[in-house]
């Protein structure tokens, strides 16, 4: 039996330029699924990440099962691939964030749909398929996470296509309830995690000094986070990952994070408006932003901050002030995105009820297109402001100030900021073409 795992390409994905390609990190869904595949059936597995690979599928040959994992902005490509391989006689399985939130839609394209985590249901499906009784749908549960105790089969991936730091995930889900977040909807607001000893074993086997953690909210469960950071300390690795601003208020957890080897954090600040934070049920405190960043800097940690445009309280003036605010709080690398109402998230349901969803073309759900009607400007103006605020934030003067502001990672920060400046030009070009089509 042969299985092909595919992560589809989307319009704003990673195979775009030398810069975006250089930032590509290894996705773990396919290596995990391969590791979960029961060995007793003698199954041959192959994985394709369209974000970093160009493939001629006609030359691949036949696969008994084709498993496709998709986010919203890549799901249409996923459906195209499903149709292609179904025509060749393959059995199609689809899962991932979008499929979990829109299972009935996905069922129109796949023989089997999987929702939620696959730790238990993937093995169940393989056994059913081998016995010729596969179900149309399998629903995973958050409590399934970590029960399989497997090491991802990273050898299936083309490691040379990704950044030097291997990816690891320990925590899944998030207990916060941000209105716009697809993670919360996928995991139903629950926290799940692998056994700490399993993660440590995974890291040891990688034999790498640097690790990139993909955990969406690693400090959601404080007890787990403390134990995990303590277990990392003897490994003497350097790592980067995600974090929420509330880490500022937990001194013990923060100290353990630093001691465990943290050197870089991606943090979702989203907005400088307290009203917008309350609107989206985000727990950030604007008055703490600068103190949070300063605290990380004092401990040698660089901060990549993400910011979102399009909240109901946003105005043209408030958006265009963001570069100055960002410089004031000291973020090393800023990133902007348009508020995207992913299907069946709370913000999607609210905007849909208000009649404000303007596009259900999932290709547009890529964080650079406006798919809803903002309150204080048009969708086109919101897209234009994404370009304008990025241009202003990535002026050479601002980039240089960020690079030299503190002594840690200056050359890297300079390079990444310049890279995002170039990337923003590609975004502007993409949007410009779309505007021309609509004119």
PLM regions: where:
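Radical SAM enzyme core and accessory elements
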Residues: 2-5, 17, 42-44, 62, ...
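Radical SAM [4Fe-4S] cluster-binding motif and immediate context
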Residues: 150-304, 311, 316, 321-324
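Flexible glycine/acidic-rich beta-alpha junction loops that bind and position SAM and/or redox cofactors
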Residues: 10-14, 105, 223, 275, ...
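Structural detector of well-ordered beta-strand residues that form the stable sheet scaffold
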Residues: 93-94, 114, 137-138, 240-242, ...
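Alpha-helical structural signal in soluble globular domains
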Residues: 36-40, 84, 88, 105, ...
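Residue-level recognition of beta-strand->loop/alpha-helix junctions
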Residues: 47-51, 69, 185, 217, ...
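Acidic, low-complexity intrinsically disordered segments
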Residues: 1-210
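Structural recognition of alpha->loop->beta junctions
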Residues: 104-124, 256-266, 321-336
């Amino acid at each position: 039996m042969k299985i092909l795992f595919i992560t589809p390409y989307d319009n704003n994905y990673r195979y775009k330029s030398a810069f975006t390609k250089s930032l590509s990190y290894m996705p773990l869904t396919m290596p995990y699924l391969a590791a979960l595949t029961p060995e007793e059936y003698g199954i041959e597995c192959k994985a394709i990440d369209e974000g970093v690979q160009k493939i001629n599928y006609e030359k691949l040959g036949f696969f008994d099962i084709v498993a496709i994992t998709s986010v919203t902005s890549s799901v249409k490509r996923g459906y195209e691939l499903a149709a292609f391989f179904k025509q060749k006689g393959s059995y199609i399985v689809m899962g991932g964030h979008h499929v979990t939130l829109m299972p009935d839609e996905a069922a129109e394209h796949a023989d089997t749909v999987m929702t939620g985590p696959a730790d238990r249901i993937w093995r169940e499906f393989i056994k059913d398929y081998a016995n010729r009784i596969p179900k149309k749908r399998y629903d995973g549960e958050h409590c399934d996470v970590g029960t399989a105790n497997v090491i991802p089969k990273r050898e299936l991936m083309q490691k040379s296509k990704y950044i030097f730091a291997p990816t690891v995930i320990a925590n899944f889900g998030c207990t916060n309830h941000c209105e716009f977040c697809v993670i919360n909807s996928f995991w139903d607001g629950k926290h799940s995690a692998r056994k700490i000893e399993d993660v440590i074993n995974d890291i040891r086997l990688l034999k790498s000094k640097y690790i990139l953690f993909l955990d969406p909210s690693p400090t959601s469960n404080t007890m787990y986070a403390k134990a995990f950071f303590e277990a990392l300390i003897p490994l003497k690795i350097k790592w980067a990952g995600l974090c929420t601003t509330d880490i500022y208020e937990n001194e013990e957890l923060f100290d353990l994070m630093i001691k465990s080897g943290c050197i870089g954090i991606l943090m979702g600040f989203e907005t400088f408006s307290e009203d917008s934070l309350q609107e989206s049920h985000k727990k950030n405190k604007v008055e703490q932003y600068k103190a949070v960043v300063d605290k990380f800097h004092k401990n040698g940690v660089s901060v990549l901050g993400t910011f979102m445009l399009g909240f109901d309280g946003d105005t043209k003036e408030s958006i265009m002030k963001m570069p100055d605010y960002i410089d004031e709080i000291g973020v090393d690398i800023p990133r902007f995105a348009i508020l995207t109402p992913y299907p069946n998230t709370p913000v999607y349901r609210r905007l849909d009820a208000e009649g404000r969803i303007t596009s259900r073309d999932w290709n547009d759900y890529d964080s650079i297109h406006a798919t809803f009607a903002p309150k204080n400007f048009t969708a086109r103006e919101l897209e234009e402001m994404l370009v304008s605020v990025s241009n202003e934030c990535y002026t050479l003067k601002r980039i240089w100030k960020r690079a030299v502001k503190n002594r840690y990672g200056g050359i890297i920060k300079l390079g990444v900021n310049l890279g995002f400046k170039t990337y923003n030009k590609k975004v502007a070009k993409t949007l410009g073409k779309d505007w021309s089509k609509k004119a």
